[in-house]
């Protein structure tokens, strides 16, 4: 059974978040949470919160046991970019 959780509008670059995602791919949930807790990256709390959400979805919606869960697939795609403009005279 596949359980899904999505995080949108994260404030960390996808290239940096992929480094954290690669650390927990294929690991059991407890091991992945321990890795994220001690990883000194800005994306670690975001990925940790996402993992907790996926575990909560599995337990609540599908009545699965947390001990049996592992990270089958995790990926990071690029989201929307903010265009920042400083209105000034350009001439």
Curated annotation (Swiss-Prot):
UniProt-recorded Gene Ontology molecular function terms: rRNA binding; structural constituent of ribosome
UniProt entry keywords in alphabetical sequence: Ribonucleoprotein, Ribosomal protein, RNA-binding, rRNA-binding
Entry annotated with the keyword Coiled coil: no
Pfam family, one: Ribosomal_L22
Biological process terms in GO annotation: translation
Highest taxon in the source lineage: Bacteria
CDD domains linked: Ribosomal_L22
Family to which this protein belongs: Belongs to the universal ribosomal protein uL22 family.
Quaternary structure annotation from Swiss-Prot or TrEMBL: Part of the 50S ribosomal subunit.
PANTHER family named in the record: CHLOROPLAST 50S RIBOSOMAL PROTEIN L22-RELATED, LARGE RIBOSOMAL SUBUNIT PROTEIN UL22M
Protein name, per record: Large ribosomal subunit protein uL22
Gene: rplV
